[in-house]
Amino acid sequence: MASPGIEVELLGKGHSDLGEVAPEIKASERRTAVAIADLEWREMEGDDCEFRYGDGTNEAQDNDFPTVERSRLQEMLSLLGLETYQVQKLSLQDSLQISFDSMKNWAPQVPKDLPWNFLRKLQALNADARNTTMVLDVLPDARPVEKESQMEEEIIYWDPADDLAADIYSFSELPTPDTPVNPLDLLCALLLSSDSFLQQEIALKMALCQFALPLVLPDSENHYHTFLLWAMRGIVRTWWSQPPRGMGSFREDSVVLSRAPAFAFVRMDVSSNSKSQLLNAVLSPGHRQWDCFWHRDLNLGTNAREISDGLVEISWFFPSGREDLDIFPEPVAFLNLRGDIGSHWLQFKLLTEISSAVFILTDNISKKEYKLLYSMKESTTKYYFILSPYRGKRNTNLRFLNKLIPVLKIDHSHVLVKVSSTDSDSFVKRIRAIVGNVLRAPCRRVSVEDMAHAARKLGLKVDEDCEECQKAKDRMERITRKIKDSDAYRRDELRLQGDPWRKAAQVEKEFCQLQWAVDPPEKHRAELRRRLLELRMQQNGHDPSSGVQEFISGISSPSLSEKQYFLRWMEWGLARVAQPRLRQPPETLLTLRPKHGGTTDVGEPLWPEPLGVEHFLREMGQFYEAESCLVEAGRLPAGQRRFAHFPGLASELLLTGLPLELIDGSTLSMPVRWVTGLLKELHVRLERRSRLVVLSTVGVPGTGKSTLLNTMFGLRFATGKSCGPRGAFMQLITVAEGFSQDLGCDHILVIDSGGLIGGALTSAGDRFELEASLATLLMGLSNVTVISLAETKDIPAAILHAFLRLEKTGHMPNYQFVYQNLHDVSVPGPRPRDKRQLLDPPGDLSRAAAQMEKQGDGFRALAGLAFCDPEKQHIWHIPGLWHGAPPMAAVSLAYSEAIFELKRCLLENIRNGLSNQNKNIQQLIELVRRL
């Protein structure tokens, strides 16, 4: 048996070798690094020590072990019905399809229901998403209709001559609801079966629900654990930043890029105390504990973990600026390793390298545990022990603990004892005090990117290191490195926007108004046509800039994955280099609220429009518009077109789930040729599945329209003061083929509009007329319109005008008025009488609107119109989004449930034909041209 000195020498050498592994580690190098880690344990083991290193990453260490692990993983995937997604991964678009299940709040009955139940509830930000309880005793009609119809089809086409015995065996082998599934196993199985973009969506929704996020995903089947860097790229958090001197302010940043001290909690051998419960208590302000980390006292929390041991989770504390809520003065990351550190040595080594302090929970410290920790002799991390020493090994614990004190450079203050009689609140305060002391001293601060760098050195796979992702990142950087000032970049590189586009849009509006005039002067019409052609020729004389050409190359990639990676990288890269500048000092953010009745100049918003992907697509649209206009006028032969393929590229992006701009937010005008060209290409790509229902939202700023749509359908509309769209964006949702006949459409086109001003009719002049036209256009295109309100008397005047204009045409979509309580989750919804008052605009406002639309004083209250009855679910009260105070607040369960009911009602109305006549894409094209 090797002496301790020799052991340490060997381990030190192994650690040095690992530290020299290149950041871009290859597969062979990764296997070498894993083998070195395994060799450390082989050198440490003595003949009298039965402990075996078992992280499942090295097949050579035990010929039987990987086989057992493989079968365990495969059994779990088979149990959950996910084995078919191991080659062709489950995609984000697959998970967002509208099906029979979208209309039913059904409970899972068999394990194969669990992944879909989790995804559906997570999409709706339901705090109960992690519950894997299955219901046995349910009525037959409580099962999803889609599954019933599938069973009926099987009965219809069943051949009695088929092998009955085989049918009996397959029936008897179906998993039963008695099979318990640990929620962490479900999460790991689903992540292993999902592509990178669905993994990213899962992480984003989990963050909104304040669930702990998977950081290292174990995969014993393929002998690689994966560090999930890409999966967390899209998570952005806002918190209160208070410098030592000066004024505090809110800061917004990606969790991947912002640096914070990290504290790891791990288990060694066995522990009577729950790490996850302790972490939840440490993270929760006041007496309300939020179950961020799933723990043993929750439903099914005691079920054995089959595949999730080795999972590393992460969560953060973010300060809010309120002394009564802020546990720590700065952001702090907390890491939790599932399983024993001896069985997951690579993960433990990673945690020791990235953490400022590691808390080790254990009941036993014997020779085996001593050897384990002795190998960390050179570590600079602080170590703390949380012991429960009442298992007959108290003396042994003390003996080895005393030997570890000089090895780990700790003292007796680093040893905490927690037994059943220990006061939990006092113990939590003590843990917080330790963390606070570490924060006040110089300590390591790391970002998730820094953690990924350390993971590569240890041989862990990083999800972001695939070739397609890195190629897309390189292309993004070639574009963004040239952006020093976003305003200057738009002026110099996106030349067709700005004044040329505004002038062309104004001329086209005037020309359109002449179309409706009784006797338009031909001379004026000819002059407008001449001016428009002149502007379009000026635009067509430009070539796309180098940045736009690089962007076009990125979205033209034949690889769908590379194209999607590129678009995501562009979103984050542009947000990083072109962060909007506040037009008011930071302290005003605390008191900012939308002014629904004032005369605020909407042309000068608090947040300037940030540079985004939509600006590059808008530039492509203007090249196409200018070229098409010249071809129509006979000024350019059709054979000389250079940009005819642009709408096809954009339609492919729409099919992948990217929101596309329908109405330009800066001019509030629609590039008709570009939009119709895009829809034509969409019709070609969808072939026979081109029946559409159009659902739009309109309303005042800051009422949560985009968040509502994102929660309801899993969409990606921009949210927040700094990035909310000012025009209108559209996104396509696919209806499952088995449900499209019943619903009456193949796709739902969802349109999210920017805010519409309210208040006096003449206060904003031409701007008001533009927004009234925008409301009329969106409501006129729609089968269903959701009108989002925040106060009981704030129906914008632009919407009143749109009602009056559409009533003349006879086109009345199905309207749903949504009143969102943005500030208080506990305020009850309006009573029926209040609902009717909600639809009665102020008398002077309604009379003025009627007079402007030449209807005299005959304007009726909205509640009196046939299409809007407050008693028939046309008016909805949505509780507040947050349960508690952000940034540590979770999404309210009441909000999630109310959104689900609204979604169910909308789909029922579409299904029952209450949403006016459904359209196909060609009809929508004609409607766009007409409106």
Swiss-Prot record:
Family (UniProt): Belongs to the TRAFAC class dynamin-like GTPase superfamily. Very large inducible GTPase (VLIG) family.
Gene: URGCP
Induction: By HBxAg. Up-regulated in gastric cancer tissues and also in gastric cancer cell lines (at protein level).
Disulfide bridges in this chain: none
In-chain residues carrying the UniProt-annotated modification Phosphoserine: S3
Main location class: cytoplasm
Protein's job: May be involved in cell cycle progression through the regulation of cyclin D1 expression. May participate in the development of hepatocellular carcinoma (HCC) by promoting hepatocellular growth and survival. May play an important role in development of gastric cancer.
VLIG-type G domain sequence ranges: 689-929
Keywords annotated in UniProt: Cell cycle, Cytoplasm, GTP-binding, Nucleotide-binding, Nucleus, Phosphoprotein
Source superkingdom: Eukaryota
This protein's record includes keyword Phosphoprotein: yes
InterPro entries: G_VLIG_dom, GTP-bd, P-loop_NTPase
Pfam families linked to this entry: URGCP (PF25496)
Name this protein carries in UniProt: Up-regulator of cell proliferation
Tissue: Strongly expressed in hepatitis B virus-infected liver and in HCC cells. Also highly expressed in well-differentiated gastric cancer tissues and various gastric cancer cell lines.
Cellular-component GO terms for this entry: cytosol; nucleus
Keyword Nucleotide-binding assigned: yes
One of the record's GO molecular function terms: GTP binding
Localization: Cytoplasm; Nucleus
